[in-house]
């Protein structure tokens, strides 16, 4: 993990935002989300549990920010998709149009994984 990736680069243009609430404790949701969105070595990945922030940045234009906060119904996850291309910032949304178009569906898939993982009983041991 490189914490420098937690700072949002400039330019950064908002492309999509989605959010959902999961009825589980924040610490379990955060851990499940981090596991669900960790892209492995092909992308930059940073986690700051104290700030409730997870960042995935890959390629030259793509940046996904997840903010995890307490909610009266459990835990809220806010997803922000950004274009951080530099140079040729204008080309990010063109190159990423499929990812932008599928972001709501993809976020729903992540939420389902997190919901299943965070609602599972912690194993004894």
Where are these predicted regions, by residue range?
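A conserved amphipathic terminal alpha-helix motif
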Residues: 1, 34, 84-125
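Short, hydrophobic/aromatic-rich segments at coil-to-beta transitions
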Residues: 1, 47-56, 120
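General beta-strand recognition
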Residues: 28, 53-55, 76-78
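Hydrophobic/aromatic beta-strand elements that line small-molecule binding cavities or substrate pockets
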Residues: 19, 43-46, 63-70, 80-81
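A generic structural micro-feature
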Residues: 10-12, 57-60, 71-73
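Hydrophobic ligand-binding cavity/cleft-lining segments
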Residues: 1-44
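A short, structured loop/turn motif at beta-sheet edges
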Residues: 23-27, 68-76
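Beta-strand elements of well-folded, non-transmembrane domains
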Residues: 22-24, 62, 83-87
